[in-house]
Amino acid sequence: MYKVYEKIESINGSVITVRAKGVHYGELARVKTAFGDSLAEVNKLEGDVVSLQVFAGGRGISTGSEVRFLGRGMLVSFSDYLLGRIFNGSGVPRDGGPALKEGRVEIGGPSVNPAKRVIARRMIRTGIPMIDVFNTLVVSQKLPIFSSSGEPYNELLARIAMQAEVDVIVLGGMGLKHDDYLYFKSALEEAGALSRAVLFVHTASDPTVECLMVPDMCLAVAEQFALKGRDVLVLLTDMTNFADAMKEIAIIQEQVPSNRGYPGDLYSQLASRYEKAVDFDDAGSVTILAVTTMPGDDVTHPVPDNTGYITEGQFYLKNGRIEPFGSLSRLKQNVNGRTRADHRALMDNMIKLYAAYRDALEKRSMGFAMSEWDEKLLTYGGLFEAQLMDLSVNIPLEEAFDTGWKILGRCFTPEETGIRSDLINTYWPA
């Protein structure tokens, strides 16, 4: 039975306060406003004083507006009919299609029991050499993409969504510009990837509280697909916008701020989402790749700083490329011994030589004389950046290995590479 109240104690922006009993945290309510009904979510409890975040904002609400508690949290529909659909942060269709009501599940549930998980040992191929070869993405891994503003992180996510060898893509956009939303939609449609994808999109003009629901919507749907035996890749952008939405609501609620004004539970809120990554023992999997922009390119900003303690590595996007120094996949050793015999040796030695190339660049910029070895390194670095680091490169893993060997063969003798002789004998280009 619904609890109905017709007295609002206070209205502070989009947050209203009522006195109610038997209400739980995260419960939904329906608020009657002068412009129609709006959903609201309980986000603070102090005895019988209940604070609710109104999705549509405080406009049109009076102290006599009716508040009807629904006795449940936010639900999201789940079925194969979700594939190819686009929704907002409340689960309402954005694509003009019909609303879905079957198989509804509650969002924001607990993480999977570790006893039900298996150790990550399977690779997700993306067709991007800087991921597949040098920082392999592993099934059930959770990884952020740290990026400055202006970097092509949404283009990178779209590439991964189109090319990743998984069963289902769940894309969550938080605080997206409308142009970015249209870009994702058109890119997936043109590539024929929308038919295996579900999009939950919150744009910058949508209610703030919906931004907080996007990751939970995505992860609830992803978990249900995984329980049906599907391998799911969840792509989120931008987790800094998610944290800023938390910060905005915390300020309205007059919570005591922590580092740079963010709420004190920022770490827990981020961890509760990332920990949904899982490889089920007897079903599918959920893998999470999330963009985290760094304001002012500051990796010590609270959002990337806290994220780094939660995730299993990170990708750094810099100058339009995935930077090899600083980027790390902590689970890559679980899979790169199973791909091809030369994977680890090629990966390690190519990065070692690229580091030497960076030193040679610095040496040249300071006016030092270039040795024959330095010239070889400069040639190698240019080829490495053009044929493997460039984000427009789209080649299978085995072709990326062969390209790496060809680059080494053009620039060095076998002895100069530092790769062991049995691999040289097998893979060195003729």
UniProtKB/Swiss-Prot annotation:
Name of the protein described by the UniProt record: V-type ATP synthase beta chain 1
Keywords for the protein's UniProt record, in alphabetical order: ATP synthesis, Hydrogen ion transport, Ion transport, Transport
Tree of life domain: Bacteria
Species per Swiss-Prot/TrEMBL record: Treponema pallidum (strain Nichols)
One of the GO BP terms on file: proton motive force-driven plasma membrane ATP synthesis
A Pfam family: ATP-synt_ab
One GO MF term attached to the UniProt entry: proton-transporting ATP synthase activity, rotational mechanism
Keyword Chaperone: no
Stored HAMAP family: ATP_synth_B_arch
Family per similarity comment: Belongs to the ATPase alpha/beta chains family.
Function according to Swiss-Prot or TrEMBL: Produces ATP from ADP in the presence of a proton gradient across the membrane. The V-type beta chain is a regulatory subunit.
NCBIfam families assigned: PRK02118.1, PRK04196.1
